[in-house]
């Protein structure tokens, strides 16, 4: 009897496994959305021994993309081409205007990063047609074609974390009361004072914090000069600075080491809703509408989505990190400070199967890798699955959806606990009616 039961269970398991594998094998890639951090840049501020005049790259000045950054982005573009043009033949070999849309924040370094990536993704080659893709002109680089990069307007400040948000300012005051933040602040002030003394800064040395970003950028281009001019500087001090400031970057995007409730307010939930929530929901909603168009093209109400295959956003480290926080996978970042490196990217692939069921994959890459890492199974809500159900992605998005909308929420004070409860009730109502 026991042998018969075991046999039945084995046959059932194999049948389920075969059905699952068939379902996986029949998955069809329908849409790709990706966001990346710009490439290597110059420092945002001058700091001895390197001043603004030393930063001559990318047209010159502070915060500009460097040749290293251009190369990093070109490499990322080459990886995109290998995956989506050559291996999967998902995108056309030549630039097709209706297939891809590239967007950028309104800064030189992100715009040129997008251009550099596109040079790697759609490089000059025999596949481009003279007189069609580029001019029939002897002075024109053969095979080279321009690809547009669309720049954010002020109305897109929410996804770029550029809006003036009163609620977020109140949250910063609240999280300052947490022991985790207090301890990090003590360590930061101690380091600021120590480094300020090295630079002979006597005015408010506890607030001297320019060195963390400056060192990270200077060491890529002026490392020998730093060691020659700063006898106290070394790698241990550099790493200490990056690790000391790492918690404050995390706090800003809603990542706290412990449950963090202040006056009944869930600080991580509130911060992530304001910081990562707008972009996460924009990505989810665009993907959902695309899948709907795939399933029912005749009733697709958004015409541009029908042929669109690749949507990209050239942005910044904090935006990439904010998304990783909402997805629960910040551990995929392996840098010293746990912060997305230059040219790191998060990519979301949307799939359908013959039964019109949709699912997603999440891919992460930093600039030390030659390919993307599939991190889908690491996302808690995906439960270790190879493909994450679209409904699970929806649950994540709605958990961090600013309600009733971002600007209204920003103007809603934390002083009313009911505002927090109402936000959670709205999330429940939306999930109930839309799942």
Curated annotation (Swiss-Prot):
Q: Which CDD domains match?
A: HP_HAP_like
Q: Which UniProt keywords apply?
A: Disulfide bond, Hydrolase
Check the record and name the InterPro entries matching this protein.
Acid_Pase_AS, His_Pase_clade-2, His_PPase_superfam, Histidine_acid_phosphatase
What's the EC number here?
3.1.3.2
S-S pairs:
382-388
Reactions this protein catalyses: a phosphate monoester + H2O = an alcohol + phosphate
Q: Which PROSITE patterns match?
A: HIS_ACID_PHOSPHAT_1, HIS_ACID_PHOSPHAT_2
What is the source species? Caenorhabditis elegans
Q: What is this protein called?
A: Putative acid phosphatase F26C11.1
Q: Which residues form the active site?
A: 38 (nucleophile), 317 (proton donor)
The beginning of the lineage is:
Eukaryota, Metazoa, Ecdysozoa, Nematoda, Chromadorea
Q: Is Cell wall biogenesis/degradation tagged as a keyword?
A: no
Keyword Disulfide bond listed? The answer is yes
Tell me the first and last residues of the signal peptide. none
Family note: Belongs to the histidine acid phosphatase family.
Annotated GO molecular function terms are: acid phosphatase activity; phosphatase activity
